[in-house]
Amino acid sequence: MARLTVEDCIDNIDNRFLLVLAAAKRARQLAMGATPTVPWDKDKPTVVALREIAEGHIDVGVMDTASAREHAKESQVSEEEVREES
């Protein structure tokens, strides 16, 4: 496993807080089946997301409004699921 630091990524996303948000969003996308832009060598999605940012493949654009709509769609629960839990 490659060891990554904030310094490896800060050249591409210069705000540490935005870096964390972008990495978390990209890690969720990877966990949901998004195609990685770097080789995936048995690493966790968070490590792959940070490697993508460090190599300049991913930036804060990953947090656009379209992805917010995707997240809202993914989080919707059907009436059938509600009945099953009752």
Swiss-Prot record:
Tell me, in a sentence or two, what this protein's role is: Promotes RNA polymerase assembly. Latches the N- and C-terminal regions of the beta' subunit thereby facilitating its interaction with the beta and alpha subunits.
Point to the regions of Basic and acidic residues compositional bias.
67-76
Could you describe the subunit structure of this protein? The RNAP catalytic core consists of 2 alpha, 1 beta, 1 beta' and 1 omega subunit. When a sigma factor is associated with the core the holoenzyme is formed, which can initiate transcription.
Q: What gene makes this protein?
A: rpoZ
The entry's keywords: DNA-directed RNA polymerase, Nucleotidyltransferase, Transcription, Transferase
Q: Which Pfam families match?
A: RNA_pol_Rpb6 (PF01192)
Q: Which family does it belong to?
A: Belongs to the RNA polymerase subunit omega family.
Q: Does the keyword Transferase apply?
A: yes
User: What EC number(s) does the entry state?
Assistant: 2.7.7.6
Identify this protein by name: DNA-directed RNA polymerase subunit omega
Reactions the enzyme catalyzes: RNA(n) + a ribonucleoside 5'-triphosphate = RNA(n+1) + diphosphate
GO-annotated cellular components: DNA-directed RNA polymerase complex
NCBIfam families under this entry?
rpoZ
Chain positions covered by the region annotation Disordered? 67-86
Q: Which SMART domains match?
A: RNA_pol_Rpb6
Q: Could you tell me where the Acidic residues compositional bias lies?
A: 77-86
Listed InterPro entries? DNA-dir_RNA_pol_omega, Pol_omega/Rpo6/RPB6, RPB6/omega-like_sf
Q: Which GO terms describe its biological process?
A: DNA-templated transcription
Q: What are the annotated disulfide bridges?
A: none
> What is a single molecular function from GO for this protein?
DNA binding
